[in-house]
C-alpha cells in the first residue's frame, strides 16, 4: 500500500505592505483600535501583475526546498484558495503548468 504525506511546507507573502497606520490616513480609525479587535498589524497585497497562481508557485518552491526533494517527486498538487486566478478555471492547473508537472493530478479546494 502506498502512503501519502506532506513532506514540506512553504509560504509566500507579497512585498506590498499596508499597515494599520496606512488605514489611519484614509479612514477614521487607529492602529490600536484595529489591533485590539483583530490582532492584525499589517496586510500584504499582490501587485496587479501577480495572480494567485504566482503566489502559490513561490510557496510551492519553498515547500519543495523545505522537503529537500525535486519537484519531479511530487505526485499531487492541491491548491486551496478563495481567490483563484479565474472564476471558471481552477488555479491548481496553472500552478501545475508553471512548475512543469503536467503528468500528475491536481485540483483546487475552494471554500
What label would you give each PLM region?
Residues 93, 100-110:
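A glycine-rich phosphate/pyrophosphate-binding beta-strand-loop-alpha-helix module
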Residues 1-75, 97-100:
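Conserved "HGTGT" condensation-loop signature of ketosynthase/thiolase-family condensing enzymes
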Residues 72, 86-89, 103-106:
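Short, flexible active-site-proximal loops enriched in glycine and acidic residues
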Residues 47, 81-82:
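N-terminal transmembrane alpha-helices
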Residues 7-10, 80, 110:
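Short beta-strand segments
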Residues 83, 87-98:
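Short Gly/Thr/Asp-enriched flexible loops that form oxyanion-binding sites at enzyme active sites
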Amino acid at each position: 500500500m502506498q502512503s501519502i504525506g506532506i513532506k514540506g511546507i512553504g509560504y509566500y507573502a507579497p512585498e506590498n505592505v499596508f499597515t494599520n497606520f496606512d488605514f489611519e490616513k484614509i479612514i477614521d480609525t487607529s492602529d490600536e483600535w484595529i489591533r485590539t479587535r483583530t490582532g492584525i498589524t499589517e496586510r500584504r497585497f499582490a501587485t496587479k501583475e501577480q495572480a494567485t497562481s504566482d503566489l502559490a508557485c513561490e510557496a510551492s518552491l519553498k515547500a519543495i526546498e523545505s522537503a529537500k526533494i525535486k519537484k519531479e517527486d511530487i505526485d499531487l498538487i492541491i491548491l486551496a484558495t478563495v481567490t483563484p486566478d479565474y472564476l471558471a478555471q481552477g488555479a491548481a492547473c496553472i500552478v501545475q503548468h508553471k512548475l512543469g508537472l503536467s503528468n500528475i493530478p491536481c485540483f483546487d479546494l475552494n471554500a
